[in-house]
A protein has these predicted regions:
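Active-site neighborhoods and metal-handling regions in enzymes and metal-associated proteins
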Residues: 1-163
Length: 163
């Protein structure tokens, strides 16, 4: 009761990968945890709006960082979104933390990538649990939330490939 969990699912269709995740609240939770889950989803949506054809990768991270910090949360810096295609993790790295917009790789039509901001209630530092070499844990043991979609950049903007 009161826990928040992330379910991250990847699929392969005709040799092409996709990646998506969602947050779920188990029963009733605290207002603080609900705000965190909501903020993480808002950060995904804000990152999507910031991703424009011929814009820059850092535009995404800057928009996410600005929103999360305004809400009183931190953005994990050690993990990022990624290109997706015939391999599960491809270039480019899509960082969700940025101090300035207008930097990094140009976002061009045809690019397929994920946006998956991980938003922490406390500090941004995380580590990978050695028990399974996959589970991400916050160093301060405070809650974290993450939402993710896979997109293709078109001439007019992002098209969501996952639901």
């Amino acid at each position: 009761e009161g826990d928040i969990i992330n379910v991250d699912v990847s699929t392969i269709l005709d040799g092409y990968y996709s990646d998506a995740s969602r947050m779920f609240v188990i029963g009733k939770t605290t207002n603080a945890k609900q705000r965190l889950v909501d903020c993480a989803r808002e950060c995904l949506e804000i990152g999507m709006k910031a991703a424009k054809p011929y814009g820059f990768l850092s535009d995404i991270g800057y928009a996410i960082t600005k929103h999360a910090h305004a809400a009183g949360f931190s953005v994990v810096r050690d993990l990022c979104g990624h290109g997706v295609g015939l391999e599960f993790h491809e270039d480019p790295d899509v960082e969700h933390y940025a101090r300035k917009p207008g930097r990094g790789m140009l976002l061009v039509p045809g690019m397929v990538f994920t946006i998956e901001p991980m938003i922490n209630m406390g500090d941004w530092h995380v580590f990978i649990d050695a028990a399974d070499d996959w589970t991400v844990v916050t160093e301060d043991e405070l809650p974290s939330a993450q939402w993710e979609h896979t997109f293709v950049m078109t001439e007019t903007g992002l098209e969501i490939l996952t639901y």
